[in-house]
Amino acid sequence: MSRKQLALLEPALVRQALMDAVKKLSPRVQWHNPVMFIVWIGSVVTTALAVAMATGHLAGDAGFTGTISVWLWFTVLFANVAEALAEGRSKAQANSLKGINKTAFARKLREPKYGAQMDHVPADELRKGDVVLVEAGDIIPCDGEVIEGGASVDESAITGESAPVIRESGGDFASVTGGTRILSDWLVVQCSVNPGETFLDRMIAMVEGAQRRKTPNEIALTILLVALTIVFLLATATLWPFSAYGGTAVSVTVLVALLVCLIPTTIGGLLSAIGVAGMSRMLGANVIATSGRAVEAAGDVDVLLLDKTGTITLGNRQASEFLPAPGVDEKTLADAAQLSSLADETPEGRSIVILAKQRFNLRQRDVQSLQATFVPFTAQTRMSGINIQDRMIRKGSVDAIRRHIEANNGHFPPEVDRLVENVARQGATPLVVAEGATVLGVIALKDIVKGGIKERFAQLRKMGIKTVMITGDNRLTAAAIAAEAGVDDFLSEATPEAKLALIRQYQAEGRLVAMTGDGTNDAPALAQADVAVAMNSGTQAAKEAGNMVDLDSNPTKLIEVVHIGKQMLMTRGSLTTFSIANDVAKYFAIIPAAFAATYPQLNALNVMHLHSPASAILSAVIFNALIIVFLIPLALKGVSYKPLTAAAMLRRNLWIYGLGGLVVPFIGIKIIDMLLTVFGLV
């Protein structure tokens, strides 16, 4: 669930934006936008000319020049309003996070375990590595990792989701965020950051920090717009001697009006707002982007690496069956499987313990009473287990257990290979259990592919985006689930090194790669990916490696992130097309008005039959200013997104924004000319 969306033009935001827009009229702000800086200079020049004419220091029509000057100032002001509105929406979203309750004191434990002696200390004195106890009703004082316990946590202040979530030690749900509230039970949390460096602090600082850095595409487009502006500036400058040679020199006011109408002021005025709004839309989707560069990269992504669990499948794999090896009875397998899972905090491990209880009433056992040593799972060994006196029980992937058996001079039965293959062909995950050098059998873990995911992948394929499923399952299981889900490719038995190598392989082919991750073992791949979305419930290392954080911790959000990125790029491209196409109509309005007296043949270009030269020039300038206002909602909201191929999308946008950019100015300028004439304003 996304946090509450702000109304597109909320009155309070508009009022603040208008005040900020006036402040942005300062030349120190305007020179950052070269196109609008030219308009600002034109406004200053025409204002000075109007004052000089009004005071009799210069011959000319002070009323006409003053009116042109006013509308040029409006053009700059409207561009400022667009940017201020976009920034205001982002700041309003960040301000809602400032209101999150923070605790004044924390229970700092002297030892990292429940029941240890504690000291009550100010929360702002906690440092990275400190361990605190939080109980029902407490506000978590720092970002950190749960090292003991489990509790229901209200994260609505951050995610906007009213339903509480479970945070517990072990697994993928061990990360907690400062400012969230414990609803039940207790947690022992190890702080992962120092004061002022929390996730909320960094997020607010990002939104409210210094001026936003332009993205590479934005810089490239700015260079294009500046080049066009220079071309039109030189062209306009040559018109004065050209007209003077013809006998009637064009006034500076008309030349300034012509220049402002020809340069791409529409996209120049909205470009910054589009970028800020893109980050704001990400925040509206509960995704925090560390920079506009990350949002832009999301729009260019053409390979998605998707974790199977939680993204493609529901992610709640449960033990469904014990399949013993030849010569082993099912209860013996269940007994060993349960023992190997007693200290396993993962949902899969707990489901194995429960299944053994249900099938064979195996109860009342724990690691401490058995004087056993738990062997945790690692991405390198790909197995876990337990050592009980002279018994060594392991469970894990087929390859991991095979290596373990061979290392202990044992034999891996071919019958177990067939069991594994049958489980995998059904789309379930096989876990092999062994004791010492003997294979006891296979545990089947069932998962379910999410509804509608196949259709979403088909849409991505139509857009030219390749989907790759990443899973730790064996090749047969991965192939079965990949076929059911409709992904383009898969990486089975994935290790952190394999993920990293796959990303580098795609990047070497010139592709941009996006992925999600939540564990410390995902950090290298997240750091390498072009778009890396870390889960808020994930580890601190994963969050620091990624360039986005999903507050909802929903891996499927990666697809929405790509949609928002593409929408931002489409909006920028569409409004650029519209802005450049606009110039044609303005050309037909101003050129005849400015030069028909010198060259009557140019009257043939007055296809709109505008009332007079003055009304034609003024109509074009007014339209040039007002079109920015009408396009502000589109810049903030983004153009309509449809999952089409690049060629189809280009054709669609050329028809809508290219043809629209040609037709709308002809209609708009003509209507403004008629209104000016009817009301006798020219």
From Swiss-Prot:
Taxonomic path: Bacteria, Pseudomonadati, Pseudomonadota, Gammaproteobacteria, Enterobacterales
Matches recorded under InterPro entries: ATPase_P-typ_cyto_dom_N (IPR023299), ATPase_P-typ_P_site (IPR018303), ATPase_P-typ_TM_dom_sf (IPR023298), ATPase_P-typ_transduc_dom_A_sf (IPR008250), HAD-like_sf (IPR036412), HAD_sf (IPR023214), P-type_ATPase_bsu_IA (IPR006391), P_typ_ATPase (IPR001757)
EC number(s) recorded for this UniProt protein: 7.2.2.6
Protein name (Swiss-Prot/TrEMBL): Potassium-transporting ATPase ATP-binding subunit
Keyword Transmembrane helix listed: yes
Keyword rRNA-binding: no
Active-site positions on this chain: 307
Cysteine pairings via disulfide bonds: none
Location in the cell: Cell inner membrane
Assembly notes: The system is composed of three essential subunits: KdpA, KdpB and KdpC.
Membrane topology: Multi-pass membrane protein
Binding site for ATP: 344, 348, 377-384, 395
